[in-house]
Amino acid sequence: MRNSGESVGVTGGKIAEFYDEEGNKYPPEVVTVLGAGGLSSTPEDLCRFGDSFAPGGMNILSDSSLKDVLKEQPTPFSSLLKGDALLDAFGWDYALLPAYRENGYQVLGKSGGTLFYSTNLQILPQERLAVAVTYSGQAGAAKATHRIMEALMKDKGLPGPKPVSPVKPPEPQPIPDEFLKLAGFYVNTQEAVRMIFDNESHTLNVYSLASPSEDEEAKENKEKPILSLVHNGGLFHDFATGYRYYFLTGEKTVYLVMEEVPQYGADIPMYQKIDPVEKPESLSVVMDGRFWLIRNASPFAQLPDDLLVKSEEYGDLPGYVKFFGVNRVETPDFGAIAATGFRDQCNIQLFKKDGAIRLKAIQFVYSSEDIAGTLVPGENTIVIGSEGENEWRKVEQGGIMSIEKPANGRVIIFPRRQVEKVYDSIIDSSEISVPGGSLVFLAGEPGDSFSIIVR
């Protein structure tokens, strides 16, 4: 492997630039991949790495380690699924794909990516085939490796996956009582929903839950199902996509599982059932409609998705709050993970610093929006404190804003308390028209001084 290890920023060399959806070019990404078990590498080197798992390749691992890393290692949960499971191998996203297994081949794959890049590696050890794809931006790298691998196998005269034939939509059938009792509240990685069965149309309808702080239009939109599934033979069918779902009830909780996910052929849980709280707790501050301002972000944060976060409560599901995901309120200062069957979830913890409320989620620390000072007409000077915490300011009335910042400082503006930014100092000019109600994020080193003129 000739181009792996230290980043291009250290060793020098060419990289693909990153552009956002509006065509703005960002500076090279700053990210640590080694701590997550990642590689700073090129597609060519990834293919060499993939070949190290093949018989006859330049093996890095011992024979016994290779045997372990290539075999399926299912969890007890996997045995409850009707079909195969993903993430059932040591370090791989999958160690077998059913469509290849039918022809006696093992195909392994691993995705990787950052905010600026998408990467996928797929290997077929028996034939010493490895495919790696890296895109600048968020793209379907996994789909690309699948298609390239299929083409390679075809070129070599090897039997590949059989083409998927279209299936006639099944007729709706009455829903058995054993399913009807599974109606209720469910969560996924992002939100809570309500599942309701319709006996007349033989459908399962999934609705997003509204929060009291939402406007009437948003509440009306949530009266329409985000998913409508027709029952037939114990499965629930989405005619629009061709996807099929089933309920898994053999665990301590209930899951709605997608059967044979396209491209992978494996079953993936999509929703987990949760129970309403008989005696719901509340957090020590009102969470619904509250905006939280990050205090410990680096000036080099690549994309501002986590800088400004809106928390919500559910009117029909007291005792739960939504921050990054859904949390069940356990005490006035703590919310536990509700979607315990899914990855990338976190608890939330409230605490006070200097008399003001704060929220911690994973490594991120937030203050409530009321800590933001107000920018006045004329010149405003903002200095980063001795602890290096981010500063925030709000704009009461709209106007033209001129910004002067230190060399490594960062300024991002969010319009009217919306989480989509309108200005970012690393790609935009120093002057901008700002609507009233905007929030201004400032990051830098302790003692850094920013000058903002509002007129």
List the predicted regions and their residue ranges:
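Short, mixed-charge, low-aromatic patches
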Residues: 2-9, 24-25, 101-106
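Catalytic loop of the DD-peptidase/beta-lactamase superfamily, centered on the K-T-G motif
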Residues: 27-455
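Active-site helix/loop module of the DD-peptidase/beta-lactamase fold
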Residues: 1-18, 61
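Glycine-/small-residue-rich beta-strand-loop submotif within the FAD-binding core of flavoenzymes
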Residues: 18-28
